[in-house]
A protein has these predicted regions:
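Beta-rich interaction/scaffold domains
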Residues: 1-38
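Surface-exposed repetitive/solenoidal architectures
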Residues: 32-176
Length: 176
């Protein structure tokens, strides 16, 4: 388009093409639970200690929670999670703890998990899954409270939350 000579409809059409091209480059987030492929290595989680071992390098990794677990106030995880975490309907209880992860990264999926308890040991708003969600949260529930509690996370940043519900009390945060 020539500067100053394009009609509004031409500008709108060019803007739509550009927007469509940008959207095509973005990775689509799943909106239904992710099935773990045959033949891949799955890490089974049965304790809080095993959760603490999930640090970096989670991209393409699969984690399955085999029973309910409790994370206490001394639990800290500084990981951006980019794997698949399947709670299989189990509950992660937070007892004055930080969230399960620092944040859910763009390729991270957390599914089929219930979160309950209290957020503590934090200095800013956070949720059961940390500060932000860029990936997907599917078939999950959260029921938390605390001075800085924010439901699943402080913010949804291009991520998807589907078939999930959030309850709780928070004097400072949003409960999504």
């Amino acid at each position: 388009l020539d500067a100053g000579t394009a009609s509004q409809s031409e500008v709108n059409a060019a803007a739509k093409k550009l927007s469509d091209a940008v959207n095509a480059l973005k990775k689509q987030k799943p909106e239904a639970p992710v099935k773990i492929p045959e033949g891949v290595t799955v890490t089974h989680i049965t304790s809080a200690d095993q959760i603490e071992n999930i640090w970096s390098g989670t991209e393409g990794q699969y984690y399955v929670l085999d029973n309910d677990i409790t994370l206490t106030g001394d639990y800290m995880n500084f990981c951006e999670f980019n794997g698949v975490f399947d709670g299989q309907g189990h509950t992660v209880t937070l007892k004055d703890s930080q969230g399960l992860f620092t944040r859910v990264g763009e390729s991270g999926v957390v599914q089929n998990t219930a979160f309950k308890g209290t957020i503590g040991n934090v200095w800013e708003n956070t949720g059961a899954l940390g500060g932000s969600i860029k990936g997907a949260v599917l078939n999950c529930s959260v029921e938390i409270s605390g001075s800085y509690a924010c439901g699943f996370a402080k913010k949804l940043s291009g991520g998807v939350i589907a078939n999930s519900i959030s309850f709780g009390e928070s004097p400072k945060g949003a409960l999504f």
